[in-house]
C-alpha cells in the first residue's frame, strides 16, 4: 500500500494547525507515536486512514474559523471507510449505523432529509472539527492503536482550543467523549452531551437537538451558524 509507506513527519498538515500544535509535535509522547507508526509500516501493517488523511480533520477545518468540535473515538477499521474525520465515510461508501442515527437526529431537529452520502467534509469546511481521539487504527482491529499516545495528543488539542479560543461548541457523544468535559472551560464554551449515536447505545441521542442548539449558540456569540445539509 503506497499511501502508508510515509514517514509521519512528511504527512501534510495545515500551516496554522502546525504552528498551533508545534509544542505537541516535539513532546516525548508524540515521538513515541511516530516510532510506533514507523514500526507498523516496516512490518507492512495496513493502517487506516491512509497516511495522507490522518490529519484530514485539520486540513479541512480552518483553525481561524473553528466553531464546533465533534469528538469521536477511533477511526473505522474496515477498508475504504476511514477518512480522518470522526463519524464520516467517503462518498459511495455505505453509511455506518451511528452516522445513520446522526442523520435521523438532523431530520428530527432541523427537518433535514437524511443524506445519501456519509461524507461530512462540507461540515469541516465550515468550521466543524471532526476529531477522533485516536487518529489511526490497524486494519480490522478496532482500538488497536489506543496505547500509542494519540489520546494525549487529542486531549491537548481540546484543552488548547478551550484555553485559546472562545465561543466554541463541544459535542460529546457517549461516555468516552463525555470524559473529556474536564478539559473544557464551560464558562467560555457550550458543552453539549448525549448518548453515543450507535444503535447499541442506550437511548439518549435521538432527541438531543444538538444541531439546533449549536446554531443558536453560534448566533448568540456572533458567528455564522452551520449549514448541516450534506453537500
From Swiss-Prot:
Any one biological process term the GO annotation gives: base-excision repair, AP site formation via deaminated base removal
Entry keywords, A to Z: Cytoplasm, DNA damage, DNA repair, Hydrolase
Superkingdom of source: Bacteria
UniProt enzyme class: hydrolase
The keyword Manganese is assigned to this record: no
Signal peptide extent: none
Cellular compartments annotated: Cytoplasm
Alphabetized Pfam families for the sequence: UDG (PF03167)
Active site: 74 (proton acceptor)
Any one of the GO CC terms: cytoplasm
A Gene Ontology molecular function term of the record: uracil DNA N-glycosylase activity
Gene3D superfamilies membership: Uracil-DNA glycosylase-like domain
Catalysis: reaction(s): Hydrolyzes single-stranded DNA or mismatched double-stranded DNA and polynucleotides, releasing free uracil
CDD domains: UDG-F1-like
Protein's UniProt name: Uracil-DNA glycosylase
Native source species: Campylobacter jejuni subsp. jejuni serotype O:6 (strain 81116 / NCTC 11828)
